[in-house]
């Protein structure tokens, strides 16, 4: 994106495929997209950004920074959705001044925040594996929020982790897609 040999009017192509992660060397990375947007913004030969999105979503980490960068972009952003543009992918795509789905069957939306994981401890115990945890004297609350979540007590995790991310996500979508702010929850 920062090559001086690009033709004037070049459109920066940004591929958002697969699961959204903050860090990845092999797949999509929201941190890398932010760097690419900044580089394209600084290249006078580039006239616009094209976000090509096919993603079911992914993690919310770093989305606030990426949203700031997309919101502050001076060059137009066009988003094309192919098959899926859901959850964290929609968080990215909602920044387009123009949004296009490739077919009437593309899945767009799924605005919300959740966490899911598998608890393999009972399976490991059947195999004879036992988890051993040692905590420093002054670290009795270390990872308590995750231990509570694993034990079916999700209230603190929802209140302190998911709800703040969800509020940020909803506020960004409503700010970028003003017609959606008129819709009910």
Where is each model-derived feature located?
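Small-residue-centered hinge/linker elements
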Residues: 1-75, 84, 88-177
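Glycine-rich beta-to-alpha transition loops that act as phosphate-gripper elements at the mouths
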Residues: 80-86, 185
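A local structural motif
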Residues: 179-185
